[in-house]
Amino acid sequence: MNQQLIECFKALGDPIRFSIYNSLKKQRLCACEFTEVLELDISQPTLSFHLRKLKECGLIDETRDGNRKIMSINEAMLNQMKIYWER
């Protein structure tokens, strides 16, 4: 198995990161919207930590819209994960 896939599966093993990723399947979100949308009781630094972990392994992409950081699913990585599970 590819090391990047291993890191992705490990990242999704955390309940908070899994919730973040799952919410992005439905819509793109600004980093500032996660705690409200997910109703998470976590601090901004903790949220940033989890978003960074998801970005580092390639599960999510970040784009800028002015001062806002917009997060979305990395479709290429999602497809790699699907291909792995369909083998």
Task: Please place each PLM-identified region on the residue numbering.
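A generic structural signal for ordered secondary structure
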Residues: 1-9, 14-21, 54, 59
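Amphipathic alpha-helical dimerization/coiled-coil segments
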Residues: 1-5, 22-26, 75-87
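N-terminal helix-turn-helix DNA-binding core of bacterial DNA-binding proteins
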Residues: 10, 15-43, 68-76
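Short, hydrophobic-biased segments on the C-terminal half of alpha helices
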Residues: 50-52
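Beta-hairpin "wing" of winged helix-turn-helix
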Residues: 55-65, 72
